[in-house]
Amino acid sequence: MIRRIQPRCNSGLTGSVSAFEVLKKKFSTDVTVPSPVTRRQFCSVSPLLRNLPEEESDSMSVPHRLLSILSKPNWHKSPSLKSMVSAISPSHVSSLFSLDLDPKTALNFSHWISQNPRYKHSVYSYASLLTLLINNGYVGVVFKIRLLMIKSCDSVGDALYVLDLCRKMNKDERFELKYKLIIGCYNTLLNSLARFGLVDEMKQVYMEMLEDKVCPNIYTYNKMVNGYCKLGNVEEANQYVSKIVEAGLDPDFFTYTSLIMGYCQRKDLDSAFKVFNEMPLKGCRRNEVAYTHLIHGLCVARRIDEAMDLFVKMKDDECFPTVRTYTVLIKSLCGSERKSEALNLVKEMEETGIKPNIHTYTVLIDSLCSQCKFEKARELLGQMLEKGLMPNVITYNALINGYCKRGMIEDAVDVVELMESRKLSPNTRTYNELIKGYCKSNVHKAMGVLNKMLERKVLPDVVTYNSLIDGQCRSGNFDSAYRLLSLMNDRGLVPDQWTYTSMIDSLCKSKRVEEACDLFDSLEQKGVNPNVVMYTALIDGYCKAGKVDEAHLMLEKMLSKNCLPNSLTFNALIHGLCADGKLKEATLLEEKMVKIGLQPTVSTDTILIHRLLKDGDFDHAYSRFQQMLSSGTKPDAHTYTTFIQTYCREGRLLDAEDMMAKMRENGVSPDLFTYSSLIKGYGDLGQTNFAFDVLKRMRDTGCEPSQHTFLSLIKHLLEMKYGKQKGSEPELCAMSNMMEFDTVVELLEKMVEHSVTPNAKSYEKLILGICEVGNLRVAEKVFDHMQRNEGISPSELVFNALLSCCCKLKKHNEAAKVVDDMICVGHLPQLESCKVLICGLYKKGEKERGTSVFQNLLQCGYYEDELAWKIIIDGVGKQGLVEAFYELFNVMEKNGCKFSSQTYSLLIEGPPDST
């Protein structure tokens, strides 16, 4: 469940000031202060700090309280200081140093607070301290603080900020060379830039060193070599190796290990081994780092056995594996399904006295999660804590990712809460995992996670928006997907192939092929190269729309653009031809596929078998099936189900059961469609007892029935009671009219008779099915029976099914009550139903009830932009309910909702044209 976050201040349009814009203004003001030492005032960093996010609304009260405490003697013994120390943040310290504080006290306090294990200075707190010290004429200690500031960089932004500040100090003539950068400072700065891969900035700093006539040393050159090698740019790195020799210096082990790393980054292992083998010849001992780089390179290339051989040879070279060496191998073995070998290495590691570190444990936890061994993963997390190792964000993310991939979102949320309870903040990756997980079942909850990200000032990235766009598209919310695309652009994020692939694929699946084609045609102008997935989606879309000729033209266009089709592309066309009854052409296309070097897949055979069976050509269909087996192409559940469905349709249940037996013999598990086909087959023959036997087999194998399975069983029970219905009335409508609660009770009793005890999932699917056919009266009775007689609490899916059914039947008061009940138990109502409900209430003149429902939705943690999109713009706005549009907009503003600039503009423009 998405928990409600406190409403934010509404500022209408939102925006941010670029860090670079702020940096440009950094030293724009001079203030001269009289002093016994001749000096000029150094500009405060406070303008920059004002643009940084504050951690608390009362962040300025903390610095003033600190100033009051520090102005007294023996301040370090103050009980008030000790009571507030855990709440002091770097932003508070930055603000404190910008106040009228004695510089010596500031230095002492800086040292005192840094002794607190929970506190870490930021580059901004150090910058504020530097400003204070420089303005008071300090020199020697400034060099020390500047080095500490450089070393404290935690991000690219920090590194660029520090670089700009150091340049200002270095070039400001007012300081009369007192604060010029010396070799140690230059090297530390290079090291900081190298950590974040800022090689262009490193090169500029190197050139500035030369301009300042500061002579580079071996450490300088090695940092340059290492910086380029981290990015795999060995050519540029080798230029600095040449400079080492030109300077009369000798490359050392750091130089060579960097080169080995660089070649491994480029996957040029031959060159890496060449450097490795030359090291002893150059009088340079090969160390553990060199070995580990090579072992890592071999592992990345999936040459794990060679990596293990090199690992064994380390001891012959009097080198001993480090924790990183072991971890690299353990990770690779885990990723190659060689987990027993990985565990043996962990055991060997501990026996040799090398303790696994956080990264080692993270690798093992990730591996256990990939095997769905979550209990063992949690045990390992506990072991870490017992051994005094504090899991980091990456460790928790491994668990969160594992849970989300298996649809266990609530467990993932529990891990996030555990992580936060240990003073670790979720990062972009954490939220991205949650968003991906929620998108599989409830995109509105995923949007709520985006809301939380923005609240906490965690920046969404391309992956965030791609996942949300994909989720909205899969839910059929294309308007929301397009708006997210615009928001993405507004935030300076560039949509990539994945963004558009998802949209094009979903549009095609929703039979909006022309719209998908228009989007596809716009990609060249956007600088995005169409890929095989996009072409395949369009080809499949045209085929499913019965436009096989257009699909062929798209294939030709694909080939003309040198985009090679894959087996999925051909399968889409073969399926289109088969659906059109053109089996001969489909077979010829299969032959063409083989000629260009693409082997037919299981899906290819299954598509052709399906057509043969549809044409009644059982012999050729079975012959192709046998060819699959003899050629080593293993038929899948879909292949077997194709036969079973056809046999059931023909009333040949013995043949269907025979195919089920073959399926099990060949190690293929029947799926939902397989069992449902058999249930329908027996039901159509009036053999309902056999149908319930199949339901029992289904449950025993762990395959949960769907709502359609239960509808099928209800249909057969009704047919036994009333006979088969004839006439023009659609089957679902007929079932809805005939179904009574007694029929559902009979179904439940039959389930118990056949040892299929109804559980929460059974009731959930049953209610979903009954709501789908529009029988709200029976659905409500089953809903009550489930709670009162079985003690089962309704799931969010059940509530939303009832809500949707109420809305479709225009029972708005009942729908409003369902919304109230959902919110009361912490469930999230589907926005599409809420849109229909609120519009319905306003149209009936019940605007107070409509406003009340909307007010309640604001407390649920939805992404506020999405609420505005779905309810106000696409709901009451497009329905021509102008008064409701402005009323609901006003409600959001009064509740402190904060919109993106794009959404705010749409709201200001007023209701869109009515449709």
Swiss-Prot record:
Keyword Repeat recorded: yes
Keywords recorded for this protein, A-Z: Repeat
PPR repeats: 182-216, 217-251, 252-286, 287-321, 322-356, 357-391, 392-426, 427-460, 461-495, 496-530, 531-565, 566-600, 601-635, 636-670, 671-705, 724-758, 759-794, 795-829, 830-864, 865-899
SUPFAM superfamilies the record matches: HCP-like (SSF81901)
Domain of life of the organism encoding this protein: Eukaryota
Entries under Gene3D superfamilies matching the protein: Tetratricopeptide repeat domain (1.25.40.10)
Family statement: Belongs to the PPR family. P subfamily.
Protein name per its UniProtKB record: Pentatricopeptide repeat-containing protein At5g65560
Native organism: Arabidopsis thaliana (Mouse-ear cress)
